[in-house]
């Protein structure tokens, strides 16, 4: 364990073995509630250990956008790692995880991931996730998008990541349709 990580109670997998680990990154894009809500849902999954990394920009954005404090959000995770600590456990391929979700994913973080520019722990953990062939999901909230953004998304998708814009489901009989009219 690195000095920058906070150790919480480690859940055990349902079968008693090592818990399943998922890395959650919250970057500085608007939409920090997506990462917060993800952590709230994951907290109730038996045998799941969440490793949270919050960027410096995200710490500012989430205070502007939500009623949560950084401490509130950190309390939702099993472990918290400092984004400046590129030597933390999620930076290593030997740290087995089920994958990583970056929600929201800023264009800066998207670009770092698409170009293997691992200057932060979020970028390094995402790079390791891709290199190890594990699932990486990026929730890119930016809009509108210019061609440079789209090229970065394409590059990341070609590497195996899932680019998941947070678009509400408006299919047949959606409960959201009446709210929009």
Regions from the PLM with identified roles:
Residues 2-137, 141-181:
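A cross-family phosphate/adenosyl-ligand binding-site feature
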């Amino acid at each position: 364990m690195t000095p920058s990580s906070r150790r919480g109670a480690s859940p055990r997998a349902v079968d008693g073995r090592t818990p399943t680990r998922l890395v959650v990154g919250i970057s500085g894009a608007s939409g920090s509630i997506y990462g917060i809500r993800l952590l709230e849902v994951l907290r109730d999954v038996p045998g799941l250990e969440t490793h949270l990394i919050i960027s410096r920009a995200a710490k500012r954005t989430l205070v502007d956008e939500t009623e949560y404090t950084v401490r509130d959000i950190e309390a939702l995770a099993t472990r918290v790692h400092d984004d400046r600590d590129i030597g933390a456990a999620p930076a290593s391929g030997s740290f087995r995880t089920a994958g990583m979700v970056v929600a929201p994913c800023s264009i800066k973080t998207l670009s770092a991931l698409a170009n293997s520019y691992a200057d932060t722990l979020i970028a390094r953990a995402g790079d390791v996730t891709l290199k190890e062939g594990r699932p990486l999901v990026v929730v890119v909230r930016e809009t509108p998008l210019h061609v440079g953004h789209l090229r970065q998304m394409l590059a990341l998708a070609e590497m195996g990541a899932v680019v998941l814009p947070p678009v509400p489901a408006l299919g047949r009989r959606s409960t959201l349709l009446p709210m929009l009219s």
